[in-house]
């Protein structure tokens, strides 16, 4: 059995701008093994977040995606929407950079995470709430019961980001996609979250694909680094090899 958890081959993403198509991701071929971390490193606008959203099939309708993407040997682009919903948020989860848009402003934060858990498991409401409390403690949210009853706008940016991370981890995904996951956090919490990712990798063999512009973050967590610029992968290899060249 292959140890590759996700693989893309010649993946392209084009957007219709007025009367022409603009290529944001250009023939990207990458793979990630189980229990490893691949960091896509690049400046803003390089296409790294677009690539990740293409994997999750959440690009706008104006986008055209070509190429192949496999998750645990299954073709992501040929799955029905129902089949893909069973994977998204469950076996494959994403931490979004914009925590405010990732949470529904009309519902309490705890309720949203509880419902995510119950949609993908047989846990009771009480069991799901207990799971959320545990996750809030793990990601450094104080007074977890109180915070569960807060609406997104009642939390600081850093606190919301931690809640979004808890939501992504709530169903024990085997693949975590992370879009600048620690940008809104102070240095202490950032280190705590990155250490949590490493612990989950060790205990659950969770794979992480992360995009960032922060070389320090990449050096701390990555097994492999891919350098992206203008929608193209310029270099990909072991962390030390890439950073020392």
Task: Give, region by region, the residue ranges found by the protein language model.
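A short, surface-exposed alpha-helical micro-motif characterized by mixed small hydrophobic
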Residues: 218-220
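Conserved ABC ATPase "signature" region
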Residues: 75, 127-146
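Short, glycine/charged-rich "phosphate-handling" switch motifs in NTP-dependent
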Residues: 224, 236
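A short, proline-enriched helix->beta-strand linker immediately N-terminal to the Walker B motif
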Residues: 170-174
């Amino acid at each position: 059995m292959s140890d590759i958890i996700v693989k893309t081959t010649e993946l392209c993403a084009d957007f219709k701008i007025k009367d022409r198509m603009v290529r944001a991701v250009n023939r990207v071929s990458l793979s990630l093994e189980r229990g490893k971390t691949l960091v896509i490193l690049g400046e803003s606008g390089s296409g790294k977040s677009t690539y990740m959203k293409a994997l999750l099939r959440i690009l706008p309708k104006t986008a055209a995606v070509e190429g192949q993407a496999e998750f645990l040997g299954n073709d992501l682009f040929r799955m029905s929407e129902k089949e893909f919903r069973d994977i998204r948020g469950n076996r494959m989860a994403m931490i979004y950079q914009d925590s405010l848009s990732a949470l529904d402003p009309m519902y309490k934060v705890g309720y949203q995470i509880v419902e995510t858990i119950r949609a993908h498991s047989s846990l009771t409401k009480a069991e799901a709430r207990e799971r959320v409390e545990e996750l809030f403690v793990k990601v450094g949210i104080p007074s977890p019961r109180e915070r569960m009853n807060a609406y997104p706008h009642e939390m600081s940016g850093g606190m919301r980001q931690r809640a979004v991370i808890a939501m992504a981890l709530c169903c024990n995904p085997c693949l975590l996609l992370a879009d600048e996951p620690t940008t809104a956090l102070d240095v202490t919490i950032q280190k705590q979250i990155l250490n949590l990712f490493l612990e989950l990798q060790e205990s659950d063999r969770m794979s992480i694909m992360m995009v960032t512009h922060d070389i320090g973050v990449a050096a701390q967590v990555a097994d492999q680094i891919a350098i992206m610029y203008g929608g193209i992968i310029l270099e990909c290899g072991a962390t030390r090899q890439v950073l020392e060249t």
